[in-house]
């Protein structure tokens, strides 16, 4: 199946208010998707929060961009469910790691981050095989 990016973008704008707003906020991602550059759009979405010191803001920006690219990719028929779930799992893992690092840094600014363990279900567990 060949991905129909323009039709997917049109459907997203017409029928999904969240995606329509995300497309307005991230026109560079919309342009990449319109050109069928799905891997470049995914890479840009993953990097959206890089360099932002505020962890919450960085995670919100990445989440918005990743949700946009994955949803339009799904509508276009470009991303199988396993790929979407793997990307969501990867983001959940990065978000949990960043949040824990920020909390430890805030509570113990002079202590090195020694890591943590988590038992997770839901999006975290989607990577199971």
Please provide the spans of the model-predicted regions.
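Non-catalytic regulatory/linker segments of enzymes
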Residues: 1-129
